[in-house]
């Protein structure tokens, strides 16, 4: 069986353009996440209250972020994308959350095949309200669960590209350690 984290290419035009694997569709209040051992999606939780994902949410294959998971990505698109679907995306910014004292980066991207979003190159060019919605979603859903989180200002595309490059390199390091038997996922 193919594993979506390990066996799917992140793309050929990295780091700016990449393939994102969607875990959670736009508008969902079910938080799915990758089950690392099996590669299947599992239901992590149902979000408290009437709070819904403001974008398609997933990860970039063959990346390993500082939170020891694949690198998270929010893909702006007109439509909800089915879980485990691949979508071509372009990084336009990054939002960093401080969750339990740990840094958790969320790449902000646009679907390159969606005519409503494909021309955006920088998050700052989006309507200000859309950026506010992205930030508030993560603040609100954590607070509704009784957790404190700090959502930092959204940074430009060049910051996202650096994080993507580092996460791709960290994945290769992890892969080499796994092959040698020196690490566990």
What are these regions (language model features)?
Residues 1-185:
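Hydrophobic N-terminal alpha-helices or hydrophobic patches in metabolic proteins across all domains
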């Amino acid at each position: 069986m193919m594993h979506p984290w390990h066996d799917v290419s992140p793309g050929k035009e990295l780091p700016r353009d990449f393939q994102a694997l969607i875990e959670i569709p736009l508008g969902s209040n079910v938080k799915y996440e990758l089950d690392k051992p099996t590669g299947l999606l599992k239901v992590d939780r149902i979000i408290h209250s009437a709070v819904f994902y403001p974008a398609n949410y997933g990860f970039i294959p063959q990346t390993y972020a500082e939170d020891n998971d694949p690198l998270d990505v929010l893909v702006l698109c007109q439509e909800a994308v089915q879980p485990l679907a691949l979508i071509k995306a372009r990084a336009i910014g990054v939002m960093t959350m401080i969750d339990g004292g740990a840094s958790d980066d969320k790449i902000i991207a646009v679907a390159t095949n969606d005519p409503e979003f494909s021309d955006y190159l920088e998050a700052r060019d989006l309507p200000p309200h859309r950026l506010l919605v992205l930030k508030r979603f993560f603040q609100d859903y954590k607070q509704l669960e009784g957790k404190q989180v700090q959502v930092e200002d959204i940074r430009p595309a060049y910051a996202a590209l650096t994080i993507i490059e580092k996460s791709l390199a960290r994945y290769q390091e992890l892969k080499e350690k796994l092959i040698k038997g020196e690490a566990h996922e």
